[in-house]
């Protein structure tokens, strides 16, 4: 996927699934949005930022914005999305002030017009992550990014690589890669965190008692290891990395 038109066609299919399948993935995205919203709020707390306006770039069906609205966080909530189908869904959600379609490259807003920007699980999907992050940072005074750290032993398995390709991941990142993207965009990390998938997300696709027991054990093992030895955990399995970034000081 080399351009925004190709990206748009790819993701349009993901938001145009038949009824039962669409409902299932809608629940999946809403479940994932809980942890993502917690990350945004916690990073803003650490950086002492209380945004009165928030722009979610690549907002999908608006699940994250909806969760922020439910928690009363972020002030005026606006989303930008590349697909018509997702925009239509997001506009139906309560608490979101506006959702617009954009070209995947240029943010249609003046400089520093939003106090907070969000790129949650977006940068791994685009051809030039630093370029998009720099553009979002132009329009937003601070930006929260979140990416999966997939440069690990588990993600090297053939089935994992196939899944990453199926969902449109163009980059397999580690923490150093993510921080490098931030630097290339002219930004500095002010606060960061990482954690494995939440228990509820691990259990979502587990069918049957045995599968749920196995998924629960996997979650417990990973959460414990990440809590004790986070560097080792990141080398073994995927964790989600989030950082709040602001423009680097001029020299």
Give the label of every model feature segment:
Residues 1-110, 116, 133, 193-194, ...:
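Conserved N-terminal segment of class I S-adenosyl-L-methionine
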Residues 119-122:
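A short beta-strand submotif of the Rossmann-like class I SAM-dependent methyltransferase core
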Residues 7-31, 93, 127-248:
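S-adenosyl-L-methionine-dependent methyltransferase catalytic module, highlighting the catalytic core
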């Amino acid at each position: 996927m080399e351009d925004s038109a190709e990206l748009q066609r790819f993701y349009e299919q993901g938001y145009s699934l038949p009824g039962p399948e669409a409902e299932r993935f809608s629940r999946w995205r809403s479940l994932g949005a809980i942890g993502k919203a917690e990350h945004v709020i916690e990073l803003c707390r650490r950086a002492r930022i209380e945004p009165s306006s928030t722009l979610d770039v690549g907002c999908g069906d608006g699940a994250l914005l909806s969760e922020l609205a439910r928690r009363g966080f972020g002030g005026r909530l606006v989303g930008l999305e590349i697909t018509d189908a997702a925009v239509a869904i997001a506009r139906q959600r309560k608490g979101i002030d506006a959702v617009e379609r954009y070209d995947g490259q240029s943010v249609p807003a003046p400089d520093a017009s939003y106090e907070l920007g969000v790129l949650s699980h977006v940068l791994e999907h685009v051809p030039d992550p630093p370029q998009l992050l720099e553009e979002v940072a132009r329009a937003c005074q601070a930006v929260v990014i979140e990416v999966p750290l997939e440069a690990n032993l588990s993600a090297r398995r053939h089935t994992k690589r196939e899944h990453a390709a199926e969902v449109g991941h163009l980059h397999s990142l580690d923490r150093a890669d993510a921080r490098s993207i931030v630097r290339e965009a002219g930004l500095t990390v002010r606060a960061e965190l990482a954690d494995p998938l939440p228990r509820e997300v691990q259990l979502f696709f587990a069918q049957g008692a045995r599968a749920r027991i196995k998924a629960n054990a996997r979650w417990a093992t990973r959460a414990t290891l990440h809590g004790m030895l986070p560097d080792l955990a990141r080398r073994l399995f995927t964790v989600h990395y989030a950082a709040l970034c602001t423009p680097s000081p001029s020299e």
